[in-house]
Amino acid sequence: MKIKWLGHSCFIIEGNDKIIIDPYITGNPVCPESVESIDVDIIALTHAHGDHFGDTIKIGKEKGAKLVAIYEIVEYASKHGIEGEAINMGGGVRIGNTEITMVPAFHSSGFTSADFKFCGAAPAGLIIKSGKTVYHAGDTSLFSDMKLIGELYKPDVALLPIGGRYTMDARQAAMAAEWINAKITIPMHYNTWDVIKQDANEFKKMAEERGANVVILNPGEEIEI
């Protein structure tokens, strides 16, 4: 499996299938790629905020990728001609040779457009099993059931927000990394803007003091596991 970080919370996972998570590309000040360069089978969304929903419609239309997200987001996307599979907390779906399961996150979620309005607390994390197992925590605070997520799904890789302000910060994320106990932890959702500026090396130090194995990626870099 290859995991490529495109900055913020956007990753491309190349396992049994090719998946993009939270495709915030256009307008992302740290993303090194364009929508035109993206070629994926599946779009997986954690929630509806613009810095996560991003280019979902454009990628779905131009690349024919299937959307996996919570029910309300799939309903919205369907109005724009995007084919999707709706899931909800604790449930999941198999597409191709990839299984995606939705798990809780503690945040908020909502979008408004001219033709559709939705606002509600429906954020999520995602367990993506595509050869290896990846836990994308979405935007979230620290919560104790991260221990259960680690125990139940045994992820090979955990993708954790560390930026603070809107999510847990580096200190909280270090504790999350210990609880989840993935083989590799990769920080995300930081340094996109000054308001979520964090030192990833400080996170790495705190997490590794708790027994985690942290790999820091720069936008555009990938790791193979």
Q: Language-model segments: which ranges?
A:
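Zn-dependent metallo-beta-lactamase
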Residues: 1-18, 25-28, 94-97, 202-210, ...
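Glycine/small-residue-rich loop that forms an oxyanion/phosphate-binding "nest" at active or ligand-binding sites
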Residues: 54-112, 117
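Binuclear metal-ion centers of metallo-dependent hydrolases, dominated by the metallo-beta-lactamase
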Residues: 66, 78-91, 174, 178-225
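Active-site environment of divalent metal-dependent phosphoester hydrolases
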Residues: 27-28, 49-54, 74-77, 91-94, ...
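Active-site-proximal loop/helix segments of hydrolase catalytic cores
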Residues: 112-178
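Pre-active-site segment of Zn-dependent metallo-hydrolases
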Residues: 12-49, 54-61, 72, 108-119, ...
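Active-site neighborhood of phospho(di)ester-bond hydrolases with catalytic His/Asp-centered motifs
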Residues: 21-23, 40-48, 68-71, 135-138, ...
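Active-site-proximal beta-strand elements of phosphoester/diester hydrolases
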Residues: 2-5, 19-22, 99-105, 133-139
